[in-house]
Amino acid sequence: MLSGCYGGSRPANIGTAAPTFTVQDSDRKVSLDELRGKVVVLNFWATWCPPCIEEMPSLAQMQQKMKGKGVEVLAISVDADQGAYQDFLKEHKVDLLTVRDADQKSNNLYGTFKFPETYIIDRDGVLRRKFIGAIDWGTPEIQDYLGKL
C-alpha cells in the first residue's frame, strides 16, 4: 500500500447508508443516487497527489474489466484548479466517470482525511469498505470482492 496526501473530517461508517451527494462541475452533474443498483467504487483524488496519480491506471483497468459486472468507478477530484484537472484528464486519457468538487463537499461527507481515499458502496447504497492510500485494483482479491457485491 502506498502513502497518501492529507485533508478531511469525520468518517462515514461501514455498514451504514453511504452519504449521498450531487456534484456539479463545468462539464457535468453527477449524483451518487444515479448509480444505485451498481457497485460503486468512490475514489477521492487530486492531480497534486502522487499516490492518486499512480493509482489511476489501476482504477481504469479495473473499471474496464468489471463494468459489465455492474461495477462503476466514480472518481471525484478535489482540485481547486480546473485547468490542472482538465489538463490531467486529457494528458492521461482518463476513461472513468470523473467530476471535480473544488469545494470538497462530497469528500467531507465521508470524512476523507487522506488522498487517495476510496469507498466501496454496494448495489443497495450501503458503505461496505474503505481504502486509504493507493492500492492495486487489479488483484484477484479485490476483483472477486467487487464481483460478489
Task: Name each region found by the language model.
Residues F44-Q61:
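Conserved redox-active cysteine motifs that mediate thiol-disulfide chemistry
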Residues V41-N43, A75, Y119-I120:
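Hydrophobic beta-strand core positions in alpha/beta domains
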Residues D87-V94, A102-G147:
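Thiol/disulfide oxidoreductase modules built on the thioredoxin-like
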Residues E54, Q64-K105, T112-F115:
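Conserved segment of the thioredoxin-like fold in thiol-based oxidoreductases
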Residues M1-T22, P140-D144, L149:
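N-terminal targeting signals for export/organelle localization
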Residues T20-V40:
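A short beta-strand-turn-helix
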Residues K38-V40, F44-W48, K114:
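Short pre-active-site segment immediately N-terminal to redox-active cysteine/selenocysteine motifs
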